[in-house]
Structures are given as C-alpha cells and as structure tokens.
Amino acid sequence: YPRDMMRKVKKATEIVGPTYIHAHAPCTTGWGFDTSKTLEIAKLAVETCLWPLYEMENGEITQVRKIKNPRPVEEYLKTQKRFKHLFTMEGGEEEIKKIQAIADWNIEHFGLQ
C-alpha cells in the first residue's frame, strides 16, 4: 500500500516533535521469495491481517484499514521458503492454526472488519 505509506510519511513530517513509523519490509533473501513478489507478499501480510495498517496519535488508534474478506494465513505463509517446514512437518498444521489465531486477534483488537 504505497499511497498509505506516502501519506503517513507526509503526515509525520508535518508534526512538530517525534514521530514513529513501523514499516513492514519483506526480505527476499531471508524470507526466500523472488524479488518480483515483494509487493504481493507485503499486501498479503495486510490482507491476511497478520500486519494491520493503522495509525495512532497520543496512544489512541485513529485510523484502521478495514479488510472486508481476510485471506487465510496459509496464502501468506506458502509464498515464503522460511515457512516451508510448516507444510511438511508433523504438527505444522497446529502451528498454522496458532498463526491464524494471531490474525484473528488482530481483526478483533484493531477492528479490521
């Protein structure tokens, strides 16, 4: 979501005093995916609700990008070699359920739907 990032950076530069931007930056080498997939993987992180896009001011959430139909976390995990073991090892299914629970918590906590 490049426009979202640009808007947030612009807003941060207009604030007097400190600001903080926590950006999601997929790593092609460490995560094991082709460079051409960088934006797709970054968007999947948001669309699976593993990486919520939101803003806070003075400790309060002020804006949240809603996700009408969250995608299953498997779609995000399968794109990266670092998660390959979850789909081949015994007990991997349980670990994926735990990761899905994180996304579900994000949906509830941040009001993503």
Residue positions per predicted region:
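Short, conserved beta-strand edge motifs with alternating hydrophobic and charged residues
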Residues: 20-24
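Flexible, low-complexity linker and terminal segments
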Residues: 25-113
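Conserved thiamine diphosphate
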Residues: 1-15
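Structural beta-strand/beta-sheet cores of well-ordered domains, especially the beta-sheet scaffolds
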Residues: 16-19, 52
